[in-house]
Swiss-Prot record:
An annotated Gene Ontology molecular function: phosphatidylserine decarboxylase activity
Protein name listed in UniProt: Phosphatidylserine decarboxylase proenzyme
Organism taxonomic ancestry: Bacteria, Bacillati, Bacillota, Clostridia, Eubacteriales
SS bonds (residue pairs): none
Compartment(s) where it occurs, according to its Swiss-Prot or TrEMBL record: Cell membrane
Membrane topology qualifier: Peripheral membrane protein
Site annotation Cleavage (non-hydrolytic): residues: 255-256
Length: 294
């Protein structure tokens, strides 16, 4: 059972996990682990399932998925019958009113919907993946020189599950470098997997870029793929100015993760998020929601 902190009620909600039986089998049983290493984590598995989700046959899955996970379609720009396939639904866009944004220069917003963890004063060689598990930022982006600039800074991990809005956005106005792609596996990013696969973020397919923000300095933006996420699509134009809240890109089907790194003393994350992280809980947030300040 995965408990998530609800900022509005100040209580814990139980996450409804898509494919829970499959995840438990793959990461906690001997046979499942063998199948995971031989097939599930490989590109071919995610590519095959991705092709299915791109086909018209997958359209039949949409209504059942919406009903099972109680997804509010009133926030979406399309009606159910307008989606061409499951990936079209999965990467759905929302109405502007669905995700209000605070445009104040000193306010930091969430880059997307998901479950947020915040780690301050980070050690580059021991960045927290999940409580009790760490990884190296240098290994994550394969660029020691860039990584060193974020020593002692702040790390935000935004975990998305399959039921979430899967587009990610810029947290401030500014310009962003071209994304660098790093090949890797396709492990799930569910906490069950994070507790069973060491340095998972460094093993999965990922992309990173440097966002030169107007108000929070240089931000290292990392997108991590996961099981069935065969594609991370960047929709922004490198080095072209963007406004706060503009779309940066999106993930195709599957759970996935966005990680942001801030340099030391450039940001202060809201205390409730930091405290919940210390207690071992993620905090549910939506894109555009205030999560910190200068």
């Amino acid at each position: 059972m995965i408990k998530i902190y609800n900022r509005k009620t100040k209580a814990y909600d139980v996450e409804q996990v898509a494919g829970l039986k499959y995840i438990n089998w793959s990461y906690a049983s001997p046979i499942g682990k063998s199948f995971l290493e031989l097939f599930i984590k490989k590109k071919m598995f995610s590519k095959l399932y991705g092709n299915f989700c791109d086909s018209s046959l997958s359209k039949k899955k949409i209504k059942a998925f919406i009903d099972e996970f109680n997804i509010d379609m009133s926030l979406c720009n399309k009606n159910i019958d307008e989606f061409e396939n499951f990936n079209d639904f999965f990467a759905r866009t929302l109405t502007p009113e669905a995700r209000p944004i605070d445009y104040s220069e000193n306010i930091l917003i969430s880059p997307g919907d998901g479950r947020l963890s915040a780690f301050e004063n980070i050690d580059l060689d021991k960045v927290v993946q999940i409580k009790g598990y760490t990884y190296s930022l240098k290994e994550l982006i394969d660029d020691p020189k860039v990584a060193e600039e974020f020593e002692g800074g702040t790390c935000l991990i935004l975990r998305l599950c399959p039921t979430d809005y899967h587009r990610f956005h810029f947290v401030d106005s500014g310009t962003c470098s071209e994304s660098k792609k790093i090949s890797g596996f396709y492990y799930s990013v569910n906490p069950i997997a994070l507790n069973n696969v060491s340095e998972l973020f460094c093993k999965n397919k990922r992309e990173w870029s440097i966002f030169n923000s107007d108000n929070f300095g240089e931000i290292l933006h990392v997108e991590v793929g996961a099981t069935c996420v065969g594609t991370i699509l960047q929709t922004y134009s490198p080095e072209k100015r963007v406004k706060k809240g503009e779309e940066k890109g999106y993930f195709k089907f599957g759970g996935s993760t966005t990680i942001l790194f801030f340099k030391k003393d450039t940001i202060k994350i809201d205390s409730d998020i930091v405290e919940q992280t210390k207690l071992g809980f993620e905090t549910k947030v939506n894109m555009g929601e205030t999560i910190g300040h200068k």
